[in-house]
Amino acid sequence: MRFVLFATLLFCYACAPVTDNAHPPSARLIPLAQDAFSGSSVNVLSGVKQTLYTRNGLQYAAFYNANAKLVVAKRAVNSDQWQVVETSFSGNVNDAHNHISLVVDDEDYLHIAWDHHNTPLKYARSVAPGSLQLTKARMLSQPGAEAAALENSVTYPQFYALANGDLLFAYRDGGSGRGNLVLNRYNGKSKQWQRLHNSLIDGEGQRSAYWDMAVDANGVLHLAWIWRETPDVATNHDLSYAQSTDNGATWQRLNGQPYTLPITLATGEVVKAVPQQHKLMNPPVVTADAQSRPFIASYWADTPTDIPRYHVVFSDDTQGKGSPDWHEMKAPKVAENFALSGHGTKRPPISRAVLLVESTRNARQVHLIYRDDYQHGNVIALSSPLKKPAWHTQVLLDQALGAWEPSLDIAAWHNEQQAHLLLQAVAQNDGNDHQSLATAPSHIGVLVWQP
């Protein structure tokens, strides 16, 4: 494979609502490949955990190429040269749900799941530490018993690395409007998976939770979700939250009150009530600051006919009561109104966002990274201090990216305070998961930004 090296790119553009040219951010583009599939957004969906992951000085990546083959790659973090392997595995790239998720365990084995939308589990591991050669593996099921192991109807697989070297694997069992959140744990010593929860969040056959989970720097797990009543995105409602301080075994509300599992619509802690028909996008994104205080973000409209905006809901003890409560920051409204309804993968004019929280001795800063069609389809960073909100917008990449959405290398952020984002210009059929668009393969790479 031929590689082209790009020089470091520096961007600073004046954009509404406020600009700050005194200390512009820098963005660096590291090219990976030239033949990534671009007819859907399957390679670059927001919130995937994760398509990029850094461990022990190596960054791993995965994508589908123009032939729908699963490709894995790695590079040393001090080099822009990638080792790239096209595997024998493939995926249904017409459907953007069928994203790739990977992680590297404590012994440097690569774990990967791919090609899921209400379909049987596909999971593989590397044959040796640091290797890109994969072998298909099983988690919990025996041949012919996938349904009994809740591995027959998998969607949204996500991997998480725990501080003790173990892994978590989360996914939805069942379809939209009738799905449950399943959680597995990988024991790094025995190299075996076990089931933690058959149903951590239960839709009771009437709805499903669209969730995001994060492991913070202190090892606390944060789980945020919205409910959807039917496959129609317009039935999304309410932001809810749970946390775990024992690697996912038990869960509690922000105030420490334990949950009785599974969590349901009636028992979940609602941190922000958002009615149906308010253009609430799923899933939310959750993260935490250095003191494990949770932050949750998504976009929605304040009324059914209003223009959507990003909202950040966060916990803080602003009243000095000794216990935190929930607060909300509202970003500026986007440039124009739009509708959000219907089935399938949507193609709205703004993407879902990555949420970053910088914690310093004296202040906290919030960053939202997203794509905005109203700003020429560019990659945007929207930033504000937490104490006295004042939003600043900066363009990180002056390039139209189609339906691109950001997902984060969480290890690079925790270790280096750098946002590493898989970057590719892609197309997406609105509401159509059966047919991709006839677009040529496109370049794929990594955008690196340090606030």
Residue ranges and their predicted role:
Residues C12-A14:
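C-terminal motif of bacterial Sec signal peptides marking the signal peptidase cleavage site
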Residues M1, P17-A22:
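Non-catalytic N-terminal targeting/anchoring module and adjacent flexible stem/linker
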Residues M1-A7:
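Sec-dependent signal peptide recognition
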Residues N21-P451:
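Extracellular, repeat-based ectodomains that mediate carbohydrate processing or recognition
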